[in-house]
Amino acid sequence: SRRQRQMCIRDRYDKMMLRSRKQMSETNMLMILLTISGGLQDAYSYFVRGEVFSNAQTGNIVLMSTYVAKGNWHRALHYLIPVLAFAMGIFIAERLHARFKDVGFIHWRQIIVFTEMVLLCIVGFIPLGGSYDFVANALSSCACAMQVQSFRKVNSYPYASTMCIGNMRSAMESISAYMRIGDKSLLRKSLQYFLTIFVFACGAGIGGAYSLYIGNEFICCLLYTSPSPRDTR
């Protein structure tokens, strides 16, 4: 019947849109934008905001523990705050996912990207030094956590846009499997991870070089590397 044909067409359209959303959030172009942003943010927070990592929480925990052992509690707090903010960012991203995953007029990843852009914009207006850096680093780490929690695949491969250790492990694991099995898809998989690591290194290098010259306003440049919300569905 005509009604059944219309329902069939609608179902096909919905499936097509669902595939399109998935593809847009897993493309190499989006991966490049997010990963460059991840490298830039780490460089900015380290060189401009008191040698704190906005992404690499393992490094923050190592430094925090060192200062705790030395009895320098104020300096230890300097590294504890971004760790807690990162954890909170993951929680917020997951809550937004649960709340908006079934909403039709907007995709939950669009909300994540918009929130991240707002947080980074606020950081750009926070003065440098002292207690201001505590706030800036907390907001940056929260934004980074929301990003890494929300964008976890590129071309169907799990990856991290704000750190390298997992990507490096997956790359070398895929090469080892390729040498053992000979499946070329494993070689392509390893190249995907090496590309991600290279892009992160480029972002960190650019951030490390230019954040020292531009200063606090450099974080606002990240808004130009952030993907448009409409490209993250």
Question: Which sequence ranges carry the predicted segments?
Answer:
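Single conserved hydrophobic/aromatic residue that forms the stacking wall/gate
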Residues: 1-11, 224-233
